[in-house]
Design a protein with these regions (language model features):
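Extracytoplasmic cell-surface/polysaccharide-interacting catalytic and binding patches
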Residues: 17, 261-262, 268-444
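N-terminal secretory signal peptides that target proteins for export/translocation
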Residues: 1-2
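Extracellular adhesion/carbohydrate-binding repeat motifs centered on closely spaced tryptophans
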Residues: 5-273, 306, 391
Length: 444
């Protein structure tokens, strides 16, 4: 019995030894196997090291950076460490560069740290005051900037809510008067570009729809204005070349009959003053002729001398003879003509003085109401000359003053020899209009 029992114990011992040996062999083999990688336990994803232990802290995996919490669980969402704020995706990957999180844009450095303050986006400045990409108006260090919906700082002309601003190279809106290129603009204290009329210290200014300040002659709302180099609209009397203008308090050029200091002045539709002289409009006291000799003893006002000489020269070159019958007359000379004509009618028609004077006034103007006293009217006699001048006088700044068609308006019978100087711009306009001077100046 002892022998049998001993054999059984021996066999059992051998099996135990073999089992222990196999287990030891297995343990030695397992210690050499890399058990690192992703694993899941209880529905929770974690990462284990070589020995299958959960890792903690920073770890780079396949070129991506992670931070593992206790238990090897990767951090997700926002994480602040040592004053540095980072963001990890739902897969635990640390984000870098520009990222949109919860509908807001952030920028993270290469170390994952959230960036703040001034940064560059596609080479254009942007601003992240608290890490979030700023848009719209922002005040930074006491200065205003505007960032588009894409977060990029705007420069140049920019439409913001229907208003136009100009943001300089530094992104700040211009205010007040400013030159941009060769053009002048005006911006409000808030930076809004001004258009239309603006009252300034030196007068009225006008800015077009594109914001540029106008200068020189402009037609605005059917009225003419003149703006100086500084943009201020002219007011009062203004002379340019041979023409004189008068600008009203609103800056517009006077047109038609206009009362100025108790006297009526007449202006063309373009604002040039033309002195209207007829039986109802004597030569104004302020007018002074500047007579110069033109042919023999005849004289004309200096203002029409050169165009008159050119007109007569061209008439002669056309092979047409003419007689220069009359130019400038003094008040006394006009008085003498009227007196002489009255006496002639008294003798020729056996009339009393009143009857003869009335008859004389049909062809002779009352002293002070003759255009000849201005020195701007000439009488050129000759049928061919009258025909040529009637066709070409407009080109030299003269008008055929009295025609048969307009006799009821002018009060003077047809005088094909009488030409009045008004300047070429006016004469050509009148030719196209077909109006006599009274009609053209709105005096009827």
């Amino acid at each position: 019995m002892k022998t049998k029992t001993g054999r059984i114990l021996t066999v059992a011992l051998i099996f135990q030894l073999l089992a222990f040996s196999a287990c030891a062999a297995w343990l030695v083999y397992d210690a050499k196997v890399d058990r690192s990688g992703w694993a899941e336990k209880g529905g929770v994803r974690y990462y284990r090291d070589f020995h299958a232990k959960p890792v903690t802290g920073w770890l780079d995996i396949d070129g991506q950076r992670y931070f593992f919490l206790e238990g090897g669980i990767p951090a997700t969402g926002w994480l602040e460490q040592d004053g540095v704020t980072r963001y990890f995706g739902s897969d635990g990957v640390m984000l870098t560069g520009w990222q949109t999180i919860g509908g807001k844009t952030y920028c993270f450095g290469d170390d994952g740290g959230m960036l703040t303050g001034w940064q560059q986006l596609d080479g254009i400045p942007c601003y992240l005051p608290d890490g979030i990409l700023a848009t719209g108006w922002q005040e930074i260090d006491g200065k205003r900037y505007y960032f588009g919906d894409d977060g990029k700082m705007r420069t140049g002309f920019t439409n913001i809510g229907g208003d136009i601003y100009y943001l300089d190279e530094g992104g700040q809106p211009l205010t007040g008067d400013a030159f941009i290129g060769e053009n002048r603009y005006h911006f409000s204290d808030e930076g809004v570009m001004h258009t239309g009329w603006l009252t300034s210290e030196d007068g009225l200014r006008y800015y077009q729809a594109d914001g540029t300040m106008v200068t020189a002659w402009q037609e605005i709302g059917g009225k003419r204005y003149y703006f100086g180099e500084n943009g201020a609209a002219a007011t009062g009397w203004y002379q340019e070349g041979e023409y004189i203008y008068y600008f009203l308090s609103d800056g517009s050029a006077a047109v038609g009959p206009t009362e100025i200091d108790g006297a009526t002045h007449y202006f063309t539709p373009k604002g040039m003053e033309v002195i209207l002289v007829n039986a109802a409009h004597p030569i104004p006291d302020y007018y002074t002729a500047d007579p110069v000799i033109v042919e023999d003893w005849h004289r004309v006002d200096r203002r029409c001398y050169e165009p008159l000489m050119q007109m007569l020269s061209d008439c002669a070159d056309a092979g047409i003879e003419y007689i220069f019958n009359c130019g400038y007359r003094t008040l006394q000379e006009q008085t003498d003509i009227l007196e002489k004509r009255t006496r002639e009618h008294m003798e020729e028609f056996d009339l009393d003085f009143d009857e003869a004077r009335k008859m004389a006034l049909e062809t002779v103007a009352v002293p002070g109401t003759s255009e000849h006293q201005m020195g701007l009217a000439v009488d050129i006699v000759g049928e061919e000359a009258n025909a040529w001048l009637g066709e070409h006088c407009w080109e030299y700044g003269f008008i055929l003053r009295y025609t048969e068609e307009k006799a009821e308006i002018t009060g003077i019978t047809n005088e094909p020899w009488h030409f009045r100087y008004v300047g070429r711009e006016i004469s050509m306009d009148m030719k196209d209009s077909g109006l006599c001077l009274e009609e053209y100046l709105g005096a009827v």
